Amino acid sequence: MAATTMKASFPLLMLMGISFLASVCVSSRSDPQNPFIFKSNKFQTLFENENGHIRLLQKFDQRSKIFENLQNYRLLEYKSKPHTIFLPQHTDADYILVVLSGKAILTVLKPDDRNSFNLERGDTIKLPAGTIAYLVNRDDNEELRVLDLAIPVNRPGQLQSFLLSGNQNQQNYLSGFSKNILEASFNTDYEEIEKVLLEEHEKETQHRRSLKDKRQQSQEENVIVKLSRGQIEELSKNAKSTSKKSVSSESEPFNLRSRGPIYSNEFGKFFEITPEKNPQLQDLDIFVNSVEIKEGSLLLPHYNSRAIVIVTVNEGKGDFELVGQRNENQQEQRKEDDEEEEQGEEEINKQVQNYKAKLSSGDVFVIPAGHPVAVKASSNLDLLGFGINAENNQRNFLAGDEDNVISQIQRPVKELAFPGSAQEVDRILENQKQSHFADAQPQQRERGSRETRDRLSSV
């Protein structure tokens, strides 16, 4: 029985590396039935005004049971226009913040200190839960786009923001304290505290209402606010730039491209910062990577041994294919009282399934541990990935000249595992001269097409 299973599985993985999964699977599922893809419309808008927006991706475990271990991970997107600021707030979640595009000033507050950083594309920093921070788009022309991986510390999957400025939907959290507590805390009359720090909730005079209307007009909903050039210059003072040489700081930003790519050739580049390289990522057990795939190129089939990878399409278009088992997206629980039916369902689920989807900017896809995946770029494709369970993760490639785990199988086992001889298997494995990235158009097909065109032209 075990030998039969081996013979069934190895050829499928083998073919996957050769033919981009086209003939691997018993069946195929595209976008609507694919639990591994989250299109950009799956983001919920938490806040939006003329200066920008904040969006939150739906919960991963709402999509499929296979994402139960992602219950406490959420993905947020921030976008703001030039010369704007996300006003101070803190949340009950650890954050890993990555700049997707634009230029920013991030200010991080501590009880006895304040640090400001100039951030650019690829800059990354961990913000511990409860950190008060504010973010400025310092560029004159380009929008700022930031992606956050949030790990809540109170309730799994539930985020709570605490605003110092307050808005129409949520009060300044200082207003939640009683009058006596506020007066004692600030050693100031409540009327002065209310005027300077809080939204007024008592009946206002016409003069006060006029002042408030002007304030709301200039700071609509007090989350993303316009800044003058002079204010940005003031906030830029003493802001430190990210080091391009080191990724080992415990509190300062690091850039994903601060070290050379771990994989690189003419078809693509793969940058990655792991917990071993950066202390900010160690306690969260997360790696962060950035992948560039050139138009018409392929990130070769591979799988992660332990890590679940959440991937966001930053720029470009492409296709991804993931190999799983049939019915991985079903939510129903099996009935325990029918063992034969359960065994039958398990046998069905062992059939290989091809899950594929078109990719465009803003889409998110998830790669569970052990699931082979390949990504093809129809235009230059830029991807950002967060890897959960990063410690001791091994990325195993299933095709390519280097790091190809299938090529490590001993010849006697190849004879047993594959329909062809070991010599034939080796010949196919050696046909691909590239590693990690390759041309998405097989050379044999190109050669055949060229020969066909030549014959037709001669006729």
From Swiss-Prot:
Residues 238-251 have a biased composition (Low complexity). Keywords: Seed storage protein, Signal, Storage protein, Vacuole. One of its GO terms (molecular function) is nutrient reservoir activity. It is found in: Vacuole, Aleurone grain; Vacuole. Residues 444-459 have a biased composition (Basic and acidic residues). SUPFAM superfamilies: RmlC-like cupins. Residues 1-28 form the signal peptide. Residues 36-194, 254-426 form the Cupin type-1 domain. Residues 337-346 have a biased composition (Acidic residues). It comes from the Eukaryota. GO terms for cellular component: aleurone grain; vacuole. Residues 235-258, 321-346, 430-459 are annotated as: Disordered. CDD domains: cupin_7S_vicilin-like_C (cd02245), cupin_7S_vicilin-like_N (cd02244). Its main location: other. Seed storage protein. There are at least 11 genes for vicilin subunits. Belongs to the 7S seed storage protein family. This is Vicilin.
